[in-house]
Design a protein with these regions (language model features):
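Glycine-rich phosphate/pyrophosphate-binding loop at beta-loop-alpha junctions
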Residues: 1-38, 78-123
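Generic alpha-helical secondary-structure signal
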Residues: 54, 132-135
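Short, conserved charged micro-motifs
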Residues: 127-131
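Conserved small/polar residues in nucleotide/adenosyl-binding loops
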Residues: 136-143
């Protein structure tokens, strides 16, 4: 929508890549566009990283599952100076599969330096996993 508003006409994007899949449209609706063009003051865009943080905040602090598209307003608020102001943010949608939810939580924890992930490909032979464990428990990798 932001590109269409900037261009002054409905514009089709070549691709849309976001975790907010409920709002990921290549071509904005032709019926809503003139209304928004006339009445909208500003458009705020948020990065997927902002949505990940907003999702984790909702889960941890408010015990709510809200899909990424429904969190756009929460993520956008972080870009505005709204401290000590009354704000209404509509949260919607819980249409999120368990795999996506797990991935978003893991990304959020990584962004906050609360966990890290290591992937290792090992030969399928006895003792290989033990060698990797020794690397993590040794004071120096050379000792392993």
């Amino acid at each position: 929508m932001q590109v269409s508003l900037k261009n002054g006409k409905v514009t089709t994007l070549p691709k849309v890549n976001t975790i907010a899949d409920g709002t990921a449209v290549k071509t904005p609706g032709s019926k809503i566009f003139p209304y928004l063009q006339k009445n909208l003051d500003d458009v705020i865009t948020v990065e997927d990283e902002d949505l990940v943080v907003a999702f984790l905040d909702m889960v941890e602090n408010h015990k709510m599952i809200v899909e990424n598209s429904g969190l756009l307003t929460v993520a956008a608020l972080k870009q505005l100076n709204v401290k000590d102001k009354r704000i209404v943010s509509i949260l919607s949608g819980g249409n999120m599969d368990v795999i996506t939810m797990s991935s978003v939580v893991q990304q959020g924890l990584i962004l906050r330096d609360r966990i890290f992930t290591v992937s290792v490909l090992l030969p399928d032979k006895p003792g290989e996993l033990c060698r990797v464990c020794l690397l993590y428990t040794s004071p120096s990798p050379r000792d392993a």
